Regions:
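Alpha-helical scaffold domains
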Residues: 1-235
Length: 235
């Protein structure tokens, strides 16, 4: 499929009600309002078409950007391309979901994300923390830089309450993922969650809430010391 053909199919699947929901959650124009489930058949058609994925993200259309993240292979992206995706995120969904999907697959993902979290641009920092959360979720513990992850947990405890709005949300999620999936740091992450407590984030005109890290970790472990690693964070 060509980029033009994909965009036409996305437009045809758009819904005004879904679009209004996305706009209420912070999405900027342009977008069509395509249900996530309706993107999956298109994703199958585009499997392996890396160039189309890159072109889709570059459109700045929220539906196309989400589809790009479903199609792209992060391991095949260059560091420059990942930087472009992070800096090009138009709102918290591509920054907190799409970019982390691909960045977490890259062999230098941890190093890249560790730099993003220091960015003065909130959406880039969101991409950084969300990528780190994705990495600890899918990477075997023996493949993680445990000391660095431990230091990041300490940083969250110290800085989360003063961080920018959506950055707080992703830092909280990083703590949740460490407590849920990283056995060597599970207890430390739980203690961090207790210290942090409730995190206040302005979620706009939505009913969305920030999960309480301590209770969410317990729920996610399902009675086990930690939950099994996930194969991917894409959804």
């Amino acid at each position: 499929m060509t980029l033009d053909a994909v965009m036409k199919e996305l437009a045809a699947k758009g819904s005004e009600s879904i679009k209004r929901t996305y706009l209420r959650h912070g999405a900027p124009e342009p977008l069509f309002g395509v249900k996530i489930g309706d993107l999956k058949p298109i994703q199958k058609k585009l499997k392996g078409q890396q160039d189309i994925a890159l072109d889709l993200y570059a459109t700045k259309n929220s539906d196309a950007m989400y589809l790009a993240g479903l199609v792209a292979d992060g391991a095949k992206m260059t560091r420059k391309q990942l930087e472009q995706w992070a800096s090009g995120a138009t709102w918290h969904l591509p920054a907190g979901c799409v970019v982390p999907w691909v960045a977490s697959e890259h062999p230098e993902g941890f190093d890249i994300a560790s730099k993003w979290i220091d960015s003065p641009k909130p959406l880039v920092a969101v991409a950084g923390w969300a990528t780190l959360a994705a990495i600890v979720t899918i990477t075997p513990d023996d493949g993680l830089p445990i000391k660095q992850v431990s230091t990041l947990i300490d940083r969250c405890v110290k800085e989360i309450k003063s961080a920018p709005n959506r950055v707080k949300y992703t830092m909280n999620n990083f703590i949740i993922c460490c407590g849920t999936y990283v056995a060597p740091l599970a207890d430390k992450a739980m203690e961090a969650a207790k210290k942090i407590g409730a995190v206040e984030v302005d979620m706009g005109d939505t009913d969305c809430q920030v999960p309480l890290a301590e209770s969410y970790i317990i729920k996610s472990r399902r009675g086990a010391p930690v939950a099994p690693k996930r194969k991917t964070t894409r959804c």
